[in-house]
């Protein structure tokens, strides 16, 4: 009996991974519902949603303004959706372009983007810009929830430092902290338990 339970448990864990690895995009309505899930409810209806067409290419699934949400990549091994202020789109879009061109190192992507911000090619927001995301777990289209997903909330403040914000550069308990201080990608990290 114990072996049977373990096999069934393994099948439950492996099935979503195999399905995701097949690379078939979810139906448009499901992609939209999952993509906007990290947002506060009052932002969901107006957000622009980028998702995947039948050809597997990123496309606009729904026009909107204020926030941009990315649906789950059907080729990714785990569930991840994110939404960010549209003022961050030049920076985010450039990251997607670099990954699509074969650059896979996060450090290399940031090196290119930081150089382009410095040269004026990428314009960063003048005011703080939020990002909301959900990672792991999986989206349940029947309930419209993502059981087991972890929330992440950040606020981008380009070039902010510990001195300019009064925030530590190291995480401590449930306190906010600043990550990548002094760079174009400087942002305040918030824990979901706050």
Stretches found by the model and what they are:
Residues 2, 19-22:
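N-terminal entry module detector
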Residues 1-10:
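Bacterial N-terminal signal peptides that target proteins for export
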Residues 23-194:
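Primary mode marks residue(s) on the alpha4-beta5-alpha5 output face of response regulator receiver
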Residues 10-20:
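Hydrophobic h-region of N-terminal signal peptides that target proteins for export
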């Amino acid at each position: 009996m114990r072996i049977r339970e373990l096999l069934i448990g393994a099948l439950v864990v492996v099935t979503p991974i195999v399905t995701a690895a097949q690379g078939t995009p979810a139906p448009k309505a499901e992609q939209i519902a999952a993509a906007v899930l990290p947002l506060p409810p009052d932002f969901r209806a107006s957000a622009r949603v980028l998702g995947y067409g039948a050809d597997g290419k990123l496309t606009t699934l729904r026009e909107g303004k204020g926030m941009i949400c990315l649906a789950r990549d059907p080729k990714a091994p785990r569930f991840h959706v994110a939404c960010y202020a549209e003022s961050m789109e030049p920076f985010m879009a450039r990251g997607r372009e670099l990954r699509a061109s074969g650059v896979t190192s996060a450090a290399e992507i940031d090196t290119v983007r930081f150089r382009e911000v410095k040269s004026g090619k990428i314009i960063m927001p003048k005011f703080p810009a939020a990002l909301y995301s959900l990672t792991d777990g999986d989206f349940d289209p029947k309930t419209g929830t993502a059981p087991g997903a972890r929330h992440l909330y950040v606020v981008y403040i380009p070039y902010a430092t510990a001195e300019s914000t009064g925030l530590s550069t190291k995480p401590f308990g449930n306190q906010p902290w600043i990550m990548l201080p002094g760079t174009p990608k400087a942002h305040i990290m918030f824990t979901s338990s706050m």
